[in-house]
Amino acid sequence: MDIYTCLQNDHNEIKDLLDELIKLDERDSYRSVLVEQIKSGLIPHARAEESVFYNAIRAVNSDKSDVMHSYKEHMEAETLLRTLQLKDSTDMDWKETAIKLREALTHHIAEEEGKIFAEARNILSQEEANMMGDAFEKLKAKVGQEGFLKTSFDMVVNLMPPRFIDKMRNLQAPQ
């Protein structure tokens, strides 16, 4: 499966989970389960996408502004997700935050599947897109097991200039 299909599948799954969450009654106990499923889908997706897809585009494309904008949108979505987790646990305006997260992700996905995918298709061969899809799925599974602290460090590393990424990753490797 190519990287575009992998990303689109995840996008659809996360949007569906958010839609289901937003439709819930205020007192539905299933809400916390859905919030956890959204987190478990969104965080690994974002880290793997940044590492595999965004960093590949940054490495070969001289105009990095669209990809850097996408990183910013990931940070905004994760801030909303953490706010949603807090509001869910305290029963405070969680639905309003879920709607904001859904809107932010809908905007991000539209830009990514439009502008970013178009850029990538001009850069990547189909074989490379297939290889990136495999790498994305493997990394996503690994990230899903590592927790928030490790993935927060990965977000910072992914924002480094491409030539420094490996050096930064070596800083966190066990000695």
State where each predicted segment sits.
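Small-residue-biased structural context
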Residues: 1-175
